């Protein structure tokens, strides 16, 4: 953090206890059974609902918790709720924001503001900080636990799009302000601006330099989920084919291990479904020692997921794909469908005809809006039925004609 930024923030009454660089190392937010996690913010939050990565990660990372999610993000919104005013005066947006959050019944709030506010530069920072504190004060009375997200860094695109360097300097200032507010109030802060980076110069995390694409939301979800109880749950299994027997197992249970000729079969029950990764999710490692020289194929519930020679199996092979990953994708698609229904539940199209000044023209359309509720409940029940892992049948077999 530069001295100028620090001086500006201190002048605004933002207090740092451990230094801004250490703020996102604060204690993680622990989820509880039955938590309702509500995402609140601007375009960064609203667009998350069409990808579903974060809530899928939190769901599969906590299979024993009955988590549910609501997205009340609103494009171009700010900490004052101005965009939510719609046809009313901008000042009325804050009251609507509070009602939308209250209607969602959160126990946990993940809040993402600041990206559009940063266009006001340093001059707009006092109003932003004051507005953010006012928002948190209004929400804190419910006893909800909160996590604050920074804005994301703008990507440099090809001309004629402008160089984002100056705006990224502004975003640095606003990120530091949010970090300071989180420190002051002992809230979890996740620094997406600093940590959300592409793996290579060719990779793009946005569609236009500003708004995250699928890869961007996947990686952002990983960063957030790692701080909210869904990180670091890789599984590993080591087997000695000579006995046969289990040498070690992490994050899973093994049963019915048998060896018949050149084939080893066993059942695996994971503690949680695999996590997403940028490489497609291959975070389970299987080591098998004592195999006769040759090539072996691994099938899970009859689906081929890996092939390697005996020396590679001895060293350890990363296993990805298969039924568990299909299960995760089903959960993600169900989350997206549920989000679609909830969006139209709390924010229906043709608002003036349903609740506004033209509602008398077409009768009582508002009575139909609660009909979204059973559709939402149906999707959540389907997610609940999939989030807990089931035992899988593994088969490691030597390929005919493999190396002798």
Mark where each language-model region is.
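Bacterial N-terminal signal peptides
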Residues: 7-18
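Oxyanion-hole/transition-state-stabilizing segment in secreted/luminal serine hydrolases
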Residues: 40, 50-52, 74, 82, ...
């Amino acid at each position: 953090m530069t001295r100028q930024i620090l001086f500006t923030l201190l002048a605004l009454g933002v207090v740092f206890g451990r230094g801004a660089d250490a703020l996102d190392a604060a204690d993680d937010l622990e989820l509880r059974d039955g938590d309702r996690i509500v995402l609140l913010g601007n375009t960064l939050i609203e667009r998350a609902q069409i990808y579903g990565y974060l809530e899928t990660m939190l769901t599969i990372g906590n299979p024993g918790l009955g988590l549910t999610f609501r997205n009340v993000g609103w494009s171009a919104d700010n900490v004052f709720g101005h965009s939510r005013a719609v046809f009313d005066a901008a000042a009325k947006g804050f009251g609507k924001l509070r009602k939308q959050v209250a209607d969602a019944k959160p126990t946990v709030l993940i809040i993402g503001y600041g990206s559009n506010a940063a266009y006001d530069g340093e001059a707009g920072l006092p109003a932003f900080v004051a507005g953010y504190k006012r928002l948190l004060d209004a929400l804190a009375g419910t006893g909800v636990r909160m996590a604050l997200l920074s804005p994301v860094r703008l990507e440099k695109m090809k001309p004629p799009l402008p160089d984002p360097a100056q705006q990224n300097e502004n975003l640095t200032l606003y990120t530091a302000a949010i970090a300071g507010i989180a420190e002051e109030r002992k809230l979890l802060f996740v620094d997406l601006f600093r940590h959300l980076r592409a793996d290579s110069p060719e990779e793009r995390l946005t569609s236009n330099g500003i708004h995250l694409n699928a890869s961007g939301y996947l990686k952002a979800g990983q960063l957030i989920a790692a701080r909210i109880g869904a990180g670091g749950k890789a599984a590993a299994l080591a087997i000695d084919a000579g006995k046969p027997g289990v040498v070690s197992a992490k994050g899973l249970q093994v049963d019915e291990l048998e060896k018949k000729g050149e084939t080893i079969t066993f059942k695996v029950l994971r503690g949680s479904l695999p996590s997403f990764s940028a490489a497609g999710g291959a975070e389970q490692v299987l080591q098998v020692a004592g195999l006769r020289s040759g090539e072996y194929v691994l099938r899970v519930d009859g689906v081929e997921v890996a092939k390697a020679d005996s020396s590679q199996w001895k060293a350890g092979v990363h296993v990805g794909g298969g039924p568990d990953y299909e299960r995760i994708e089903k959960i993600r698609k169900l989350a997206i469908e549920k989000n679609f229904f909830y969006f139209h539940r709390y924010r229906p199209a043709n608002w003036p005809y349903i609740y506004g000044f033209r509602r008398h023209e077409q009768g009582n359309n508002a009575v139909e809006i609660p009909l979204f509720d059973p559709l939402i409940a149906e999707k959540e029940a389907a997610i609940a039925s999939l989030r807990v892992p089931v035992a899988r049948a593994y088969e490691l077999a030597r390929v005919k004609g493999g190396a002798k």
